[in-house]
């Protein structure tokens, strides 16, 4: 829902598709209007959470969506992210980093980091199985980031917030991505070569 600065309703923005199955298509062809009225309504999945980046672009996450669980909406509400991005069906929240990277967390505590176009960079976190351990969760329910690149992940079941700081490797990846997005291709190239020589995939 879009509201102006005075709280007046402007309209709706963004949406989830509601794909029709082959069976539903046959129902549309063969059933009468009265028969269709007796069926469950075809309501698309609702957005579970949203975030807005520094440029005012809206991001949404949809739980139980069949693909495109994360959306980056343009001014018309269309999704700007790659349609083939790797995602999960139990995402519960999304947040945007200072360089446009997208973070999403599942209910089981698995955290995904994507670049600004939706390409997967890192996965980390996970579910705590009968242990008290930092960085894993009983039930993750929210995620946020700050200007230093730290992540704050709420474990709703335990009632605590985990604070995660990026490793030197993750910082190097973010710097290389930032230089590339600014058009500093030669600098980015050298940074990526250094990253490849370091290896590793640890976030925190």
Which stretches of residues belong to each language-model region?
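TPR/TPR-like alpha-solenoid helical repeat scaffolds
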Residues: 202-204
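Eukaryotic scaffold repeat domains enriched in small/polar residues
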Residues: 1-199
């Amino acid at each position: 829902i879009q509201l102006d600065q005075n709280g007046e309703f402007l309209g709706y923005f963004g949406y989830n598709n509601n794909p029709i199955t082959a069976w539903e298509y046959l129902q549309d062809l063969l059933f009468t209007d009265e028969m269709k009225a007796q069926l469950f309504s075809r309501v698309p999945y609702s957005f579970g959470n949203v975030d807005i980046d520094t440029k005012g672009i809206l991001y949404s996450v949809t739980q139980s969506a069949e693909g495109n669980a994360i959306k980056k909406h343009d001014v018309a509400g269309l999704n700007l992210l790659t349609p083939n991005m790797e995602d999960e069906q139990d995402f519960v929240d999304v947040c945007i980093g200072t360089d446009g990277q997208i973070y999403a967390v599942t209910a089981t505590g698995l955290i995904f980091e994507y670049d600004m176009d939706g390409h997967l960079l890192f996965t980390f976190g996970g579910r705590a199985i009968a242990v008290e351990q930092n960085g894993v969760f009983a039930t993750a329910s929210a995620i946020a980031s700050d200007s230093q690149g730290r992540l704050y992940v709420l474990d709703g079941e335990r009632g605590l917030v985990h604070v995660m700081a990026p490793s030197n490797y993750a910082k190097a990846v973010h710097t290389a991505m930032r230089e590339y997005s600014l058009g500093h291709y030669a600098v980015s190239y050298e940074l990526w070569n250094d990253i490849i020589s370091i290896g590793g995939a640890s976030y925190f």
